[in-house]
């Protein structure tokens, strides 16, 4: 077997609306394409031996062992690869469960789809699954050492991809409140919400965190001075820069015991406490100086007591933890080294921030701490005897936490909240040393030793003893107070034809409200009046530009087939989803071979509408109308006829619809009617001569109306939207030349040709078409373009795209010509493959009063060419 292609889906997609994080592998089964597992000698035995945990997979049997039963009875390798990829991730600590395997129209080629937690780990699991299967097929086995290495690699990928525990805690709380989030590339920053309603976090820093507060908190001596000036109890201390200043500094703080720590340190690095001799002080100075970027060392009076972390969020105390340094307790027989190994094997401990607790590491600092207690690594501790491995109680160095939130004295709460405000932090971790947190600091000689920006949440969320505290909730409350919205309205538009016009018209209607509208289309990404990026921008990457922009108040997103298949949607749900039509275009691409499969692709938009939103569906297109059964939100239809049975039934049920009736675009709900405007007064309809543009206007108007836009603003929007080259390039752009007219439209499929033809057929003069088609379409589709063109035009010029998408020069034109002749053997046509030359010929050949219709590859180039021709002919 070999992998032909791997892609990552990150939003609602063809395979699942709810399970949005999926790996899709295109797999060639090669020699085993016709061999189910029961026909491969030793395969079942080899698979069970290396992965016995597959017994937990139910598969379609709905009971434990169901999948292995299918392997024993005979199933194909694509299905087996799917289950192995899932199981490998499970074994590496990433819980997943969803998978699908489907054969494509090419025999032996399968799409294998499976869930992932972390993208790189998921892709790697897919590669390992194929390698494992190939090994069992050819040798009957897969090495245990190889599997161990694979799982180790997967765990490394998981660790490298995982967010920190504090960030993860905040994200889980956001998800519980249906707040969308996305990871920004800049320094592991996370965006919560969309557009103008977004907030950002980085670990436990937020976009509300003041830089002055962070700077002050990082300046430990400055923090202490500021707090002392405010009457807060802090340790006596001073800063030194050279070792020969140490003796004077010790005297200044009142002598031993003392604490030495780096001026700009963190996570307890370089700190030594309870120093009682000159030798200890000199050794501690070397440690602290080495841990400081500026070689600056704080010398402080040591205060006896327990180490506490007090967490203040948005001015309110939310949690208190007593922190105990990394330590081991003797059992009377084991050495300290053995006790450390035993402690590190506890399931709650992991490397770094991988788990609730961090494994205890042995280094110069820990050996020094042991030495000061009179211990070595080979010391056997008495039963119950405690050996500390760190002087500081940070969880990151192996410490543990005990929740003391309910025990802290009210005066200490007041002091902590005051400290956070004095330093200027919205989220502050305040380190308190006191013999008794239940008594006021001032009564027991307690002190504030540090204030930390970006404090860790792990000790509060998962203490070793005591109640876990949901400290993420007050963070979300602060970022989104009083249920402030995190989302912006998202209106998504899809279909085979008309997407760009409908998207731009809908965005134009929304701009009448005065809101900042961001939209994506086949011509570019737009924010308000300005284009951000030119080009075909109808995929999730482009949509992400809009959703990340902090100025955008409304997002209108054109969603094309390619992006949905390639990556899924950029959003997990939308407020309004518009499906215009489904026609035979792009068939044979991306394993979408039938129009029913294409309808499933387009239906992703309708199925992604949230429960309070609306799916706006074309009642005149049976494939679109059928999507209603899978919509979890509300449904509104549009139609070119009030007599459409779906419309009649929908209105009978008090549903909402937009209909073209008696020359008007009207909205119906139950028995009442609201007329938007007469079609001939809406420029995009070409004086009501372009039925497909009327349908687009109906869809856009209805989408705006169901989302609460006032009818007068909708009317104002459709009246002022002019389908010119500037407003809608390549969409029914009509140019009046001196003696004839030119129409440019980006129609490139049979349905598009028919739509433009409904307008062209009403033209009174000569009708000349400059036509072509994309090279990646099926032969029958290109021939159909020729057949339709012969019904529309008096004369045809066939040209080809510069990019024929894999076809030889001239083959596209030959197929179109075959279609023309098949429809009308006497049809008048020429082959002029170069687009520019073909257009120039058409402009010279058309009769006075005639119409030249251009279906271009380059919309911009064609428009510029016509505008120059117009100027030169005046």
From Swiss-Prot:
ATP binds at residues 495-501. InterPro entries: ATP-grasp, ATP-grasp_RimK-type, Cya_phycin_syn, Cyanophycin_syn_N, Mur-like_cat_sf, Mur_ligase_C, Mur_ligase_C_dom_sf, Mur_ligase_cen. It catalyses: [L-4-(L-arginin-2-N-yl)aspartate](n) + L-aspartate + ATP = [L-4-(L-arginin-2-N-yl)aspartate](n)-L-aspartate + ADP + phosphate + H(+); [L-4-(L-arginin-2-N-yl)aspartate](n)-L-aspartate + L-arginine + ATP = [L-4-(L-arginin-2-N-yl)aspartate](n+1) + ADP + phosphate + H(+). GO terms for molecular function: ATP binding; cyanophycin synthetase activity (L-arginine-adding); cyanophycin synthetase activity (L-aspartate-adding); metal ion binding. It comes from the Bacteria. One of its GO terms (biological process) is biosynthetic process. Pfam families: Cyanophycin_syn, Mur_ligase_C, Mur_ligase_M, RimK. Its EC number is 6.3.2.29, 6.3.2.30. Keywords: ATP-binding, Ligase, Nucleotide-binding. Optimum temperature is 50 degrees Celsius. Optimum pH is 8.2. Residues 224-480 form the ATP-grasp domain. Catalyzes the ATP-dependent polymerization of arginine and aspartate to multi-L-arginyl-poly-L-aspartic acid (cyanophycin; a water-insoluble reserve polymer). PANTHER family: CYANOPHYCIN SYNTHETASE, MUR LIGASE FAMILY MEMBER. In the C-terminal section; belongs to the MurCDEF family. Homodimer. This is Cyanophycin synthetase. The gene is cphA.
């Amino acid at each position: 077997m070999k992998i032909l292609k791997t892609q990552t889906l990150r939003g609602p997609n063809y395979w699942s609306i709810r399970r949005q994080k999926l790996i899709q592998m295109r797999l060639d089964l090669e020699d085993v394409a016709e061999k189910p597992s029961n026909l491969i000698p030793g395969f079942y035995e080899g698979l069970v031996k290396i992965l016995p945990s597959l017994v937990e997979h139910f598969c379609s049997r709905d009971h434990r062992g169901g999948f292995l039963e299918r392997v024993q009875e005979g199933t194909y390798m694509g299905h087996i690869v799917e289950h192995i990829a899932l199981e490998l991730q499970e074994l590496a600590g990433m819980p997943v469960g969803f998978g699908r395997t489907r054969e494509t129209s090419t025999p032996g080629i399968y799409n294998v789809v499976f869930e992932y937690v972390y993208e790189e780990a998921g892709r790697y699991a897919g590669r390992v699954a194929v390698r494992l299967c190939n090994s069992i097929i050819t040798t009957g086995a897969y090495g245990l050492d190889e599997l161990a290495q694979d799982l180790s690699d997967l765990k490394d990928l998981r660790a490298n991809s995982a967010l920190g525990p504090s960030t993860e805690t905040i994200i889980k709380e956001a998800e519980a409140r249906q707040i969308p989030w996305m990871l920004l590339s800049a320094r592991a920053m996370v965006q919560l919400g969309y557009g103008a309603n977004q907030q950002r976090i980085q670990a436990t820093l937020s976009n509300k965190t003041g830089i002055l507060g962070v700077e002050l908190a990082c300046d430990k001596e400055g923090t202490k001075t500021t707090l002392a000036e405010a009457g807060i109890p802090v340790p006596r201390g001073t800063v030194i820069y050279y070792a020969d200043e140490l003796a004077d500094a010790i005297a200044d703080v009142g002598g031993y015991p003392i604490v030495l720590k780096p001026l700009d340190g963190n996570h307890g690095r370089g700190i030594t406490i309870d120093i009682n001799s000159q030798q200890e002080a000199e050794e501690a100075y070397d440690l602290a100086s080495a841990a400081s970027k500026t070689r600056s060392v704080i010398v402080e009076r040591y205060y006896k007591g327990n180490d506490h972390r007090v967490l203040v969020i948005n001015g309110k105390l939310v949690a208190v933890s007593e922190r105990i340094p990394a330590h081991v307790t003797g059992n009377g027989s084991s050495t300290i080294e053995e006790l450390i190994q035993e402690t590190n094997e506890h399931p709650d401990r992991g490397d770094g921030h991988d788990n609730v607790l961090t494994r205890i590491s042995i280094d110069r600092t820990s050996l020094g701490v042991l030495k000061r207690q009179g211990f070595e690594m080979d010391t056997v501790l008495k039963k119950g005897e405690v050996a500390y491995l760190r002087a500081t109680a940070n969880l990151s160095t192996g410490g543990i936490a005990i929740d003391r939130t309910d025990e802290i004295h009210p005066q200490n709460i007041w002091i902590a909240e005051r400290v956070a405000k004095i330093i200027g932090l919205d989220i502050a971790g305040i380190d308190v040393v006191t013999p008794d947190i239940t008594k006021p600091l001032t009564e027991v000689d307690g002190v504030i030793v540090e204030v930390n920006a970006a404090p860790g949440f792990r000790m509060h969320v998962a203490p070793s003893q005591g109640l876990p505290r949901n400290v993420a909730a007050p963070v979300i409350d602060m970022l989104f107070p009083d249920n402030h919205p995190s989302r912006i309205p998202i209106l998504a538009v899809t279909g085979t034809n008309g997407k760009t016009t409908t998207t731009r018209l809908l965005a134009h209607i929304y701009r009448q409200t005065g809101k900042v509208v961001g939209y994506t289309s086949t011509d570019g990404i737009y924010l308000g009046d300005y284009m951000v990026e030119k080009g075909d921008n109808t995929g999730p990457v482009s949509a992400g530009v809009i959703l990340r922009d902090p100025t955008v108040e409304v997002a209108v997103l054109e969603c094309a087939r390619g992006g949905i298949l390639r990556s899924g949607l950029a959003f997990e749900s939308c407020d309004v989803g518009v499906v215009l039509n489904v026609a035979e275009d792009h068939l044979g691409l991306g394993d979408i071979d039938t129009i029913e499969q294409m309808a499933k692709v387009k239906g992703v938009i309708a199925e992604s509408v949230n429960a309070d939103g609306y799916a706006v569906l074309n009642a005149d297109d049976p494939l679109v109308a059928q999507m209603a059964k899978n919509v979890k939100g509300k449904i509104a239809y549009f139609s070119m006829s009030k007599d459409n049975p779906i419309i009649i039934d929908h209105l009978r049920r008090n549903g909402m619809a937009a209909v073209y009736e008696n020359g008007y675009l009207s909205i119906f709900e139950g028995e009442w009617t609201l007329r938007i405007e007469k079609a001939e007064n809406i420029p995009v309809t070409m004086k009501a001569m372009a039925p497909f543009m009327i349908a687009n206007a109906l869809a856009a108007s209805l989408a705006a109306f169901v989302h609460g836009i006032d009818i007068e603003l909708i009317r104002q929007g459709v009246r002022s939207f002019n389908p010119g080259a500037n407003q809608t390039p390549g969409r029914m752009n009509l140019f009046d030349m001196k003696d004839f007219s030119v129409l440019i439209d980006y129609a490139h499929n049979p349905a598009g040709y028919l739509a433009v033809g409904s307008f062209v057929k009403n033209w009174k003069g000569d009708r000349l078409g400059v036509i072509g088609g994309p090279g990646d379409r099926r032969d029958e589709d290109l021939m159909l373009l020729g057949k339709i063109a012969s019904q529309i035009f008096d004369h045809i010029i066939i040209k080809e795209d510069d990019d024929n998408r894999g076809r030889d020069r001239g083959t596209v034109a030959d197929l179109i010509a075959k279609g023309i002749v098949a429809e009308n053997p006497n049809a008048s046509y020429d082959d002029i493959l170069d687009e520019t030359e073909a257009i120039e010929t058409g402009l010279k050949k058309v009769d006075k009063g005639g119409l030249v219709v251009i279906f271009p590859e380059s919309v911009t180039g064609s428009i510029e060419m016509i505008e120059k021709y117009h100027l030169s002919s005046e």
